[in-house]
């Protein structure tokens, strides 16, 4: 099972990815985690990423795609993976399609969690309160100003990725405003179809 979960910040991608990871016994691949691991491991692509990150730059699409390509070759990803935080742009989506084609792999599903942006801020604020109440640390970007920036960036750069996958005929949508178990059930239904 190879899949991508799309949706704006606060849509529940992390929650659903975690559930899918446990249910399908496949890794959840976060580009941020992969970048840090590649840098730590000193891989050729990790060294390129480190040079860019140390200089304060944004890691290029080519480097990110290279890190994803390396990661999906690891033994735990042989039976599939869930991409989390990637692709973020149409250019990355196109590069991923090319890379998977070269590896003779296909995506089984691209699922977008569709949510009401106005309700997302309330969801983010609730998550922050629950995290604090549980004694955890609130994400630095779980505040109204940062959230607005994140949602604007999503709208501008990442939302077009949905249109790209729709044009490929692989995009499925799920109502991300439903409760967590209902969203999980809707995703399961798509994956079993």
Swiss-Prot record:
ATP binds at residues 10-15, 127, 178. Pfam families: ADK (PF00406). It is found in: Cytoplasm. Residues 126-142 are annotated as: LID. One of its GO terms (biological process) is AMP salvage. Its EC number is 2.7.4.3. AMP binds at residues 31, 36, 57-59, 85-88, 92, 139, 150. Residues 30-59 are annotated as: NMP. Keywords: ATP-binding, Cytoplasm, Kinase, Nucleotide biosynthesis, Nucleotide-binding, Transferase. PROSITE patterns: ADENYLATE_KINASE. It is an enzyme of class 2 (transferase). It comes from the Bacteria. It catalyses: AMP + ATP = 2 ADP. InterPro entries: Adenyl_kin_sub (IPR006259), Adenylat/UMP-CMP_kin (IPR000850), Adenylat_kinase_CS (IPR033690), P-loop_NTPase (IPR027417). Catalyzes the reversible transfer of the terminal phosphate group between ATP and AMP. Plays an important role in cellular energy homeostasis and in adenine nucleotide metabolism. Monomer. This is Adenylate kinase. It comes from Beijerinckia indica subsp. indica (strain ATCC 9039 / DSM 1715 / NCIMB 8712).
């Amino acid at each position: 099972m190879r899949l991508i979960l799309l949706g704006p910040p606060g849509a529940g991608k992390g929650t659903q990815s975690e559930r899918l990871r446990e249910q399908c016994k496949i890794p959840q691949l976060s580009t941020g985690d992969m970048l840090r691991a590649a840098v730590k491991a000193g891989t050729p692509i990790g060294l390129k990423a480190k040079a860019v990150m140390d200089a304060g730059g944004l890691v290029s699409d080519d480097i990110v795609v290279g890190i994803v390509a390396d990661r999906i070759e690891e033994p735990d990803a042989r039976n599939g993976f869930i991409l989390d935080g990637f692709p973020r742009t149409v250019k990355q989506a196109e590069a991923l399609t090319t890379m998977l084609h070269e590896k003779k792999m296909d995506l089984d599903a691209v699922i977008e969690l569709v949510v009401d942006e106005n309700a997302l801020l309330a969801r983010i604020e609730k998550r922050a309160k629950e995290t604090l109440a549980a004694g955890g640390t609130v994400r630095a970007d779980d505040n109204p100003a940062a959230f607005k920036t994140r949602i604007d960036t999503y709208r501008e750069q990442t939302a077009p990725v949905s249109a790209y996958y729709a044009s490929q005929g692989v995009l499925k949508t799920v109502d991300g405003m439903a409760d967590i178990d209902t969203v999980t059930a809707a995703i399961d239904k798509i994956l079993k179809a």
